[in-house]
Amino acid sequence: MFRKILFMVLALSICLPTMCNAQKKEISKAKDNVKAGKSLEEAEASMRKLLTDSANKDNEKIWLVLFDAVRKQYETVNEQMYLKQKADTSKLFLAAYRMFGVLEGLDSVEWNLKGVQPAKMKYRKRHAEYLNQLKGNLYNGGLFFVGKNDYKNAYSLFAAYIDCAKQPIFAAYDYQNNDKRIGTAAFYTVYCGYKQNDAERTLAYADVAQQDTIRLIMTYQYMAETYRQKADTTKFVEVLESGFARYPQSKYFFSHLFDHYYKQSKYDVAIALCDDAIEADTSSIVALFAKSTVLLAQQKYNDCVSICDKVIEKDKNFADVYLNAGLVYFNQATYIERTMRHSREKTQKLKALFKKALPYMQEYRKLAPNEKSKWGIPLYTIYLNLNMGREFEEIDKLMKK
């Protein structure tokens, strides 16, 4: 047993210097490449590989060489652009993005090594000043990638821009209170996440995005659609309500909220919603039509047809409102037919109601010829009861197809 332990100790004592020498050579090679301005991506990759070893994660020298490798890539592209040479703009922005990651990581390492004492931090002030000058590249780079429909990279840059406000290295700059573009950057993370169909990314900075009041209406819509796709009805409705409260003239928030309340048979809430929308925009025929739909469901027929006629006055081509008005009379007629005993009075009432329903249903058919499932049976019944032979024969053949 003793021999085995002794052998292991000897083997380790032989391997450690070899490993250290190999690591030193790798660092030295990377430094030489950076100094010569060649194989910069290779130098960056080798330093990142070293940092994957937990034994190296606190090695400041590796972090600094890594930073120099990335910085040199950034400066190379920047120089090409300055000299108006052919340059890959995306490489400039991505190198800037990686520099932030490297120096923020080094700052964390130094903080831990120095025993959480800011006064002993050797690099923080210098690196913070350097990155502060480049911070705009994260924002502009995000816009650049949005323009290229590269939403993945755009999201990464905007997220890094926002996170600067939380990074200890930038504490002296108080970005949270001094940077007015954080809200807009957050909006773009919502947008990019939505375009990637990534719910987690869409919602990650959604609260911050609401600081951008200019684009708030779009933020609410992307949030609402994301919650709807997640089948999170509670959050979906909450966002819709917030959106409608701020933008009562928006058809998006109104229509989706109305559909929710109507399907839940919350008719009083739906009516109140319609009234708020009408108050906000008296010319809104959508809200008027929606209100007529609720009144029809509540069997408040006189109020319903009154509103339908108002909509028709405003827009004679609004097809569905003719259906609602026609159903006001048709539904009453079918109810009488089911409940009243046969009599002359019953026949007279039926004919009177069917005659009132007729022009609305005919106009609905004219405006919505493909909606046979909605106008077919009502017109068939009306023609039959009003003894309209020619019209009845035509629709009878149509219904049998």
List where the protein language model places each region.
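Start-of-domain marker
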Residues: Q23-T89
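Structural marker of alpha-solenoid helical repeat scaffolds
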Residues: D53-A55, C164, D212, R246-Y247, ...
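Canonical positions in the second alpha-helix
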Residues: L50, Y161, V208-A209, S242-G243, ...
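TPR alpha-solenoid repeat register
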Residues: I62, F170-D174, A185, M218-T219, ...
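Single-residue signature of alpha-solenoid repeat helices
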Residues: A43, A96-M99, A154, T202, ...
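Residue-level recognition of tetratricopeptide repeat
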Residues: N56-N59, P168, L216, S250, ...
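Structural register within alpha-helical repeat arrays
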Residues: K29, L66, Q73, L134, ...
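Short coil/linker segments at helix-helix boundaries
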Residues: A69-N149, S156, C164-T184, F330-Y360
